[in-house]
Amino acid sequence: MKRIRFFDIAKGMAILAVILGHSAIEANLFMPHRTAQIIVSICFSFHMPLFFILSGYFMHPERKFRWAKESKQLLCTYAVTALCVLIGVTCMATLNHESRVLALRQWGMAALYGSGDVSDLTLWPVDFRIGAIWFLLALFWARLLLHFFAKLPYTFIWVIACFLVGYGSSRYVWLPWSIQAGMCAVAFLYLGYLAKKYDVLDFVRRVPYIWINAFLIWIIDIVFFDGMSMAMNSYGPHPILAVVGSIAGTLCVIGISQLFDKVAVLGDTFSRIGQASLAILCAHLIEDDVLLQSWQSYLDMLRTLFPQVPLVLLSFIVRLPIDFAGAALLHYVPKINEWFYPQLAKQHQLNRAGIVHKRAFPLEK
């Protein structure tokens, strides 16, 4: 399927929202501020739902589940990123004259458990969370489950049941590998799949007032936001509003992306960021975990140097080049780069197909 640029733009906006949201959380922990809380509400109201919905949009669950491809793109990517975290925290422990063994044990357990945040409901004690790459594990489970449900009658019922079981069980126990997060994410993937199947975007284009309704719902969701986190199946005290609001927010961001697509500079910039969103997510996770114990002291230093600049903005500005540099580095690592940049794997396949075609038909012009 030909790449749709405004979807890349939407993913670019979403990955920036991930980094900005985490920057706001750190800034708010350091010095609680209403601006940071508003930014958290906006970012977390849509960024992860958008990634799952867009993933579902390009799925073909009626086909066979491609174990090799999904494992490389999601599980191997998770493993490489987690390994980089372990190397990074070991280096930081050495620099800070702390126990390398303790750092490896704590972060190794976090990587093994694969939880997006710390929980008291884990099967065994886990001191740290692996963080944002919970998304990779959850997406793997969600894709696998949707492929299974798509071959059953009443797929919609199975998807709802899966969401309810994942959501309900997570109130009592938090299983490893973000299994329950994946069970809930199935619903968002399925919505994306249905949006493609029934050409919802074309319908919205023909009925413009839907944009207004979606925007109003999204604003209401942001105003009443109280801690939605797909990582831990936490949808706040108003779970229905959180889910509906995240869908409305995703639709609004796609609408904004279509507008950006008409402006050359904005379209080019955000689409490039979107195409690198998986690599940026993993680079951001490495930075976030490795520097976890140091961010508070860094924020104190930044506040002293630039007292007039909002702390959230300072944190975001510092993180962004680190994450972009890490993503760029991943682009140049042979073989592994195809896991973090799926378009490279696709291009490689096309090149190989072209070579085979030329060998089969050497005289063809």
Q: Where are the language model's segments positioned?
A:
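Alpha-helical transmembrane segments and their immediate juxtamembrane cytosolic regions
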Residues: 1-365
